[in-house]
Amino acid sequence: MKTRSKLAAGFLTLMSVATLAACSGKTSNGTNVVTMKGDTITVSDFYDQVKTSKAAQQSMLTLILSRVFDTQYGDKVSDKKVSEAYNKTAKGYGNSFSSALSQAGLTPEGYKQQIRTTMLVEYAVKEAAKKELTEANYKEAYKNYTPETSVQVIKLDAEDKAKSVLKDVKADGADFAKIAKEKTTATDKKVEYKFDSAGTTLPKEVMSAAFKLDKNGVSDVVSTVDSTTYKTSYYIIKVTDKTEKKSDWKSYKNRLKEVILKDKTSDRAFQNKVISKALEKANVKIKDKAFAGILSQYATTSGSSSLKK
C-alpha cells in the first residue's frame, strides 16, 4: 500500500482545496470559512495559502488523472476488482489496516479511489503496450533473448567466505552440487535453477554471469546488492546445461510477447507517454499559474498547449 499511497497522499490530504475551488456555483471566493474577532478567513484566503504547497500540487495532479482516466477508461475497471484489491491489502495488514490508512492520510473510500485510478492507468498502459507487438519489436527482443539455462548456485553472505568456497569448488575433483548444498546460505537451501533472460528468480547480475559461461563452466564470485535492504550477497554459479538458441524468432513468440509487454509497461517513459496522450485527448488546460508545472513530466516533444497553462 505504501507505493500506492504515494500516488494519492495529496489527493485526500487537501481534497477540500479542490472542492472549495470547484464549488463556485455553491459558494463564492469571498465565502467565510472561519470567522473571528476582527477578521475572517475566506475560501479565497485558504486556497491561496495552500495551493503552492507540495501536498496541494500532488492533490491537483492526482485529481486530474483520476478525472481524465475515469472518463476515458471508467468502464474497464469494475467496483468488484477495486474491492478485491482493497480487501487483499486490508487482509495483509490485518488489525493494523485502519491505523495504516490513518497514518497515510487516507480514508477507506479515498484509498479505493486511489486503487481505481491506479488500475485505470495500468489498463491504459497495457493496451498501449499491445500496440508495440510489431514484427520489428519481436525481432529486436529475439536478438536480446537467451533461452533456458540450467545452473547450480551457491549463495553466500560474506565476501571472504565466498572466496574460500570458490577455491573449494574449483579444486580438482570437486563436487559442486554437494558443496553448494552444504555451503549455501539461501534460506530455502535451493541450489538448482532454470531460467531464460526474461526470468526473475535470480538477480540479473547472476543470470548475466551464467549466460557467459559454457556448459560445466564455473563463475568467479558475483556480488549483488538488494535494492530494498542494500545488503550485499555473493554468488558462485555452475552451468549444468544450456539450450541452443533456435534461428527463427517465431519459435519464442509467446515468450517474446511477455518480454515486450513487461518491458513497455514497466518503462517510466512509456507510461508517461500514455498519460500524456490521455491528457491531450481530454484537452486539459491549467488555468491557475500556481499549478502550471504539475503536468511537465508528461509534456510531449510537440509541446501540446493542452499541457500548459
UniProtKB/Swiss-Prot annotation:
Gene: prsA
Function: Plays a major role in protein secretion by helping the post-translocational extracellular folding of several secreted proteins.
S-diacylglycerol cysteine-type lipidated residues: 23
GO function terms (MF aspect): peptidyl-prolyl cis-trans isomerase activity
Domain PpiC: start-end pairs: 146-241
PANTHER family registered for this protein in UniProt: FOLDASE PROTEIN PRSA (PTHR47245:SF1), PEPTIDYLPROLYL ISOMERASE (PTHR47245)
Protein name per the record: Foldase protein PrsA
Keywords, alphabetical: Cell membrane, Isomerase, Lipoprotein, Membrane, Palmitate, Rotamase, Signal
GO BP annotations listed: protein folding
EC number, UniProt record: 5.2.1.8
UniProt key word Isomerase: yes
Species in which this protein is naturally found: Streptococcus agalactiae serotype V (strain ATCC BAA-611 / 2603 V/R)
